[in-house]
Regions:
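C-terminal binding/interaction regions
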Residues: 1-55, 60-77, 83-162
């Protein structure tokens, strides 16, 4: 089993020192889903939500969330993202909206946390903009889809891993 890297032997938290690691290309994608009512789904799909373009605002919020990851997660490094994209897929049958946040950089540490923070922020924004219509929305299944680069190499999520 791998050791935790964010703790010293005495148990105190520490930001991992990455100064000796080479700058390499890093990329990650994360996903998550929000389950909404038929009313919310229609309002988002038809651009009739009272607060405006829900997915447009959520896309920008997801990008901002990814960029501000190190301000939210205490031991994360500040990562100079070279790209961040947030996309959405709407499933009419299940009244759900799935977000994917893809991030990349050239640096000393990965961008998984930025992708996770981006997708989480996008989904939270959908909730915020639609909560007047449906307080029972459920955010679920947030996880890394894929990551590449660095010492640990390429990873692709396999559903049966859980």
């Amino acid at each position: 089993m791998a050791e935790f890297t964010h703790f010293k032997k005495d148990g105190s938290a520490v930001m991992v020192d990455v100064h000796e690691k080479p700058d390499t290309y890093r990329a990650a994608s994360a996903t998550g889903t929000i389950q909404v009512s038929p009313e919310v789904f229609a309002a988002v799909r038809d651009h009739t939500a009272k607060k405006g373009d829900v997915l447009g605002v959520a896309r920008l919020a997801g990008i901002m969330g990814a960029k501000k990851n190190a301000e939210l997660i205490p031991l994360c490094h500040i990562v100079p993202l070279t790209n961040c994209e947030v996309t959405f897929t709407m499933d009419e049958d299940t009244h759900s909206i799935t977000a994917v946040c893809t991030t990349s950089c050239v640096g000393k540490t990965g961008v998984e946390m930025e992708a996770l923070t981006g997708v989480s922020t996008a989904l939270l924004t959908i909730y915020d903009m639609c909560k007047a219509m449906d307080r029972g929305m459920m955010i679920r299944d947030i996880h890394i889809l894929e990551k590449d680069g660095g010492k640990s190499g390429h990873y692709i999520y396999q559903k049966e891993e859980k």
